[in-house]
Design a protein with these regions (language model features):
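A generic secondary-structure signal for well-formed alpha-helical elements
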Residues: 21-27, 81-82, 91-98, 127-134, ...
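Surface-exposed patches in mature extracellular/periplasmic domains of secreted proteins
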Residues: 28-29, 98-108, 135-139, 182-188
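Mid-domain, small-residue-enriched loop/turn segments at the edges of structured enzyme/sensor domains
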Residues: 44-51, 81-122, 138
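Secondary-structure capping and boundary motifs in well-ordered enzyme cores
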Residues: 3-11, 58, 62, 66, ...
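Active-site SXXK
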Residues: 6-31, 65, 123-127, 171, ...
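Conserved catalytic neighborhood of penicillin-recognizing serine enzymes
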Residues: 25-87, 145-177
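A penicillin-recognizing enzyme superfamily signal
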Residues: 1-3, 7, 116-122, 126-234
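Structural recognition of the beta-strand scaffold that forms the well-ordered cores
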Residues: 29-30, 64-66, 74-78, 90, ...
């Protein structure tokens, strides 16, 4: 339930690529992946670094950018295709508390924002549910001793369409590739299931995140130390 631990790249489908697809782009749309200054990026260098210098490809598709989790591409896509305000609004509609959103390039494109795992799972569940967000609950109903229903989630639960169905389909298609042999989440593929998901690693390996879905369930996990101590590796 921690909301102050950055979730890293797991945020990208919710804050960058989902909104980009929803606003008229596609997995095949081009994005610049090069060490060039990005208008709107506020660090002195002017752009975020990728995991390795050899990952700069020049121009790549949004699909490739998400599968390889390239930070420079995500930042370019955020400022070229989405915008800070739109990105924040999508996260709010996906049930993320405004207190957990860092409305900056780093917060939205790199995952410096500290979403809780129930917020992250709720966002990915909306992707799995054809773009419709259903407020997560830890129960289905509360029944009194006489059998009367005190609370029923189906009556209390907030529901809203956040992404178009076509956007959700494109996201699932790309997220399946993220868990494929060449994706950053390949180790999450198991048991012959169709799995779609996205990894996230924050600075100094202080935490590792994965949010994913099958045809039955959506889950989000954060692996790290209670004292936020750096892990040995990712």
């Amino acid at each position: 339930s921690y909301g102050n631990m950055p979730i890293g790249s797991s945020i990208k489908p919710l804050s960058v690529y989902g909104p980009a697809f929803d606003l008229g782009n596609s997995p095949g749309s081009p994005v610049i992946n090069a060490p060039l200054k990005i208008e709107g990026w506020t660090t002195e260098k002017g752009y975020p670094s990728n995991f390795s210098d050899g990952s700069y490809t020049g121009v790549e598709t949004l699909r490739y950018a998400m599968v390889k989790s390239n930070n420079t591409s995500a930042a370019q896509a955020l400022f070229s295709y989405v915008g800070i305000e739109n990105s924040v609004n999508y996260l709010l509609k996906l049930g993320v508390s405004s207190n957990h959103i860092e409305a900056t390039g780093a917060g939205l494109a790199l995952g410096a924002s500290g979403l809780s795992m129930i917020e992250l799972a709720g966002g990915f569940a909306a992707i799995a549910n054809k773009g419709e967000y259903l407020e997560p609950y830890a129960f289905t109903k509360v029944v009194a001793s006489d059998g009367s229903i005190y609370l029923d989630v189906q009556q209390e639960q907030i529901r809203r369409q956040v992404f178009k169905e076509s956007t959700a389909w494109m996201l699932v298609d790309v997220l399946k590739q993220c868990v494929g042999n060449n994706g950053t989440g390949s180790k999450a593929k198991f048991g012959g299931f169709t799995i779609a998901g996205k990894t996230g690693t924050n600075s100094d390996y202080r935490g590792v995140t994965f949010a994913g879905m099958t045809g039955y369930y959506t889950c989000a996990v954060w692996i790290g130390c209670d004292n936020y101590k750096a892990l040995v590796s990712n």
